[in-house]
Amino acid sequence: MPVPSPYLIDMSNLLEIKDRVIVLMGSTSGLGRALATGLAGEGAIVIPSGRREVQLSALCHEIDPAGNRTLCRTSDVRNRESIDALRDAVLDKFGRIDVLVNAAGVTFKQATVSMSEDQWLALMDTDLTGVLRACQSFYEPLKQSGRGRIINIASLGSFRAFYQVAAYAASKTAVLSLTRSLGCEWARDGICVNAIVPGVFPTDLNIKLIVGTPRGDEMLMRTPMGRFGKPEEIVGAAILLASDGARFITGQTIVVDGGYLASGVNQ
């Protein structure tokens, strides 16, 4: 006779995300794209989105050529109406939304003393206010889901100073603060809000800054694993945070960095 399990949930399905409806903001390239394909590979219904229609169409076709388990619709996190239209289209097709991933981001490298206010505000509009817009827009369907999840993508710049990217670092630090605040504020609405901090992952956003540069070489030296991250290596953390395995985790940050933040002297 089987021994009764002491757990109140089925532990065999703890990390199951099959058929969860996941919307990814900013997923036409880089880590967002890797998250889209990785989560779809685990059986989730994945709706990637972004501003670049050609790249988005190719990604949707890769996820599901028939289009039954995805939706191809551009959106812009700088525009609330665009976000709302995406939300409504997803609800019309699938009837619910379980997970929101905020991966949209821009950056630039410039001495802070010469950075214009317009440059600062433009970056904040995407990297910080865009996250807020999406969270507000998707709040109600995530609440109705009963297992709503928000996963915000932050940065090592939230913890370490990087030369001449002050606006980006400030925006991502604010994203972590927003994550903690919403994690507490929306906990009793059944929405868990967490963040992932990627380590050094070459993407379209940063490749010119870190590949074959003194900055990149220093980052590798400070990473105990001695290499850059691979896009697919961020997917595991997202699977956890999107699953029932994270139903008592909120307002927290998972760092996926090959040991960078824990590092002291590596040689």
Residues covered by each model-derived region:
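Active-site helix of classical SDR
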Residues: 135, 171, 179
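Conserved glycine-rich cofactor-binding loop
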Residues: 21, 28-29
